[in-house]
């Protein structure tokens, strides 16, 4: 009788549940979705009992538990009975089962209708639907939802407890966030997470955070006043609103609105980007004990006028003080061994640099390039190197290597009438007199000079004729680029590598035309019969070349913008049939050229499509005349 009674009760209960499901379309739909999708979802994956992964579950990024053996379901469902649930769900023992780790209140009801009790119930925090989730990582936000939600919290963004990571650029450029509070559970804050949040004022870092990127997390947060860290955090700390590692040996990030900072004596490293774009920073005190200043640490600190580097400092990294407002004399202490690329680039108010006795490298190598640490310091007049430095020296304010065989850099504001390069110099470095407009008069190059570097005299003030000694074996094509007062380049007839004709620089056999000086004055220019290649920008802005241009019949290649802005060339230019390669814009802005007559019947394959870009001349193909 008891057995019969139990069977009747079970049948009646099943009938009631079935009736409820049929009469409740929401419940019925949920049940159907559960019964079908839970068996077929992602079945192509090879997964194991209890393995967790992030998937798109019912349209939401959720964590689910994969079960491939019904015997293990009791780990996830209380009161589990294998036969009862396998029959109810219509699943076989060898089929994968997907069961949500966490469910909402609504989902819990239909699971209860099926007689299934999840081992945990997840109730979302207010505002969770404002974020784009990847599992438990926030990867972005829904703009209108977040804006509406923050309007109810006075701009306070409280990161949900569920969140373990704030991903790359998650909240970049969000102007309506004013305060950020992280909660226990958050582990990682990725690069650029809050970059350019212009109205962000404060940030609270919870005790659970283990990693904060040093790549512009709070860059451009110009109104940020304070970064505070929970005192129980094991990895990070804060002092006066500045973020440090726990031991305060590394200064990680300063708030964008900071005006003064007394760096603790415990700090050995100013981290990269630490004060980057802190435009209100007027004073920073660096104490002995500091050993390195990271890349871009004080970049664009445009109010920072005075910096005293401590006597323990060893390295100044890339762009460390790029475009800072350092004024007057800069002393590099004896302890400093390395100054990397662009460290003081565009520090336009430095007037003098004193280099200590142990500096070994500038710009990361023994040579100086375009990213020279002191280039474009427009008011820099003098380098002074201590005599006991083994790697560098100075003379008349110019920086050399130790034995003065290489001229490294003239300060941007260096002044001289008639420039005499010392007889010891074998190499004039890249960009060495770049932009030195106060270097005027003639330049005298010594016999024994071997090489002249990239743009070494570009945009400088030297004038008249330049005489190249017989000893020179290397001249970069841009060495005299935009040196607008040079009238001629003459090469010693005994030089084995170069030659000149009509003030134009060629290789020795005149098969390559390298450069014509800006102030070259010629009427009706005819190029030599031997010429095969005209280098790029060779006649750039040579506006004193007037009349016609005659190209020789052996010419093969004209490189990019070769005759750029030669506005004095006029009439008709005939392109020989021998020309097989033409790069872009060779007659760009040559407003006087009216016709370009090409011997070729159509554009050769080796001619760029934009070969006559920004030239309004009429082009004729298949020209057979004189």
Regions found by a protein language model. Name each.
Residues 1-20:
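N-terminal single-pass transmembrane signal-anchor helix
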Residues 22, 31, 309:
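Phosphate-coordinating loops and pocket residues in cytosolic domains that bind phosphorylated ligands
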């Amino acid at each position: 009788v008891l057995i019969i009674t139990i069977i009747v009760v079970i049948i009646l209960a099943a009938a009631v549940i079935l009736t409820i499901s049929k009469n409740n379309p929401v419940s019925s739909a949920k049940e159907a979705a559960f019964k079908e999708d839970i068996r077929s979802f992602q079945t192509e994956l090879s997964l194991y009992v209890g393995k967790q992964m992030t998937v798109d579950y019912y349209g939401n990024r959720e964590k689910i538990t994969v079960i491939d053996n019904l015997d293990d379901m009791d780990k996830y469902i209380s009161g589990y009975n294998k036969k009862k649930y396998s029959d109810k769900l219509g699943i076989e023992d060898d089929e994968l089962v997907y069961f949500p780790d966490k469910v909402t209140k609504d989902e819990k009801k239909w699971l209860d209708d099926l007689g299934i009790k999840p081992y945990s119930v997840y109730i979302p925090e207010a505002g969770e639907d404002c974020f784009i989730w990847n599992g438990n990582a926030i990867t972005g936000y829904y703009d209108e939802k977040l804006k509406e939600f923050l309007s109810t919290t006075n701009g306070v963004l409280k990161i949900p407890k569920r969140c373990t990571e704030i991903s790359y650029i998650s909240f970049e450029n969000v102007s309506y966030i004013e305060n950020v509070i992280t909660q226990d559970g958050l582990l990682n804050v990725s690069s650029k997470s809050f970059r350019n949040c212009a109205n962000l004022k404060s940030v609270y870092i919870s005790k659970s955070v283990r990693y904060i990127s040093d790549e512009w997390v709070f860059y451009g947060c110009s109104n940020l006043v304070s970064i505070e860290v929970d005192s129980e955090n094991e990895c990070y700390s804060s002092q006066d609103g500045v973020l440090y590692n726990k031991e305060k040996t590394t200064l990680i990030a300063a708030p964008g609105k900071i005006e003064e900072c007394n760096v603790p004596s415990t700090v050995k490293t100013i981290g990269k980007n630490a004060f980057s774009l802190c435009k209100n920073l007027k004073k920073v005190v660096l104490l002995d004990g500091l050993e390195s200043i990271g890349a871009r640490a004080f970049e664009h600190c445009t109010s920072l006028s005075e910096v005293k580097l401590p006597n323990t400092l060893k390295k100044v990294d890339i762009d460390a003080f790029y475009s800072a407002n350092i004024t007057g004399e800069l002393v590099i202490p004896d302890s400093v061994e390395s100054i990397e690329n662009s460290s003081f680039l565009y520090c336009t108010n430095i007037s003098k640099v004193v280099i200590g006795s142990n500096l070994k490298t500038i710009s990361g190598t023994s040579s100086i390039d375009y990213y020279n640490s002191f280039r474009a310091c427009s008011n820099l007049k003098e380098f002074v190197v201590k005599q006991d430095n083994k790697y560098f020296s100075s003379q008349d304010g110019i920086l050399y290597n130790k034995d003065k065989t290489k001229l490294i850099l003239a300060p941007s504001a260096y002044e001289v009438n008639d420039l005499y390069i010392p007889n010891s110099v074998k190499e004039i470095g890249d960009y060495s007199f770049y932009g030195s407009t106060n270097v005027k008069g003639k330049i005298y190059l010594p016999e024994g000079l071997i090489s002249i570097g990239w743009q070494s005299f570009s945009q400088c003030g030297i004038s008249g004729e330049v005489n190249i000694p017989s000893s020179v074996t290397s001249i970069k094509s841009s060495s005299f680029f935009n040196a607008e007062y040079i009238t001629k380049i003459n090469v010693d007839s005994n030089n084995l590598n170069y030659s000149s004709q009509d003030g134009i620089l060629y290789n020795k056999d005149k098969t390559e035309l390298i450069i014509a000086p800006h102030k070259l004055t010629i009427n009706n220019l005819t190029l030599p019969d031997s010429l095969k290649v005209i280098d790029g920008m060779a006649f750039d802005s040579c506006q004193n070349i007037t009349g016609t241009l005659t190209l020789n019949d052996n010419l093969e290649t004209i490189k990019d913008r070769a005759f750029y802005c030669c506005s004095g060339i006029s009439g008709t230019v005939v392109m020989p049939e021998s020309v097989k390669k033409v790069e872009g814009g060779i007659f760009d802005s040559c407003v006087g050229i009216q016709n370009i007559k090409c011997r070729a019947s159509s554009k050769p394959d080796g001619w760029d499509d934009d070969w006559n870009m920004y030239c309004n001349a009429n082009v004729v193909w298949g020209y057979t005349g004189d």
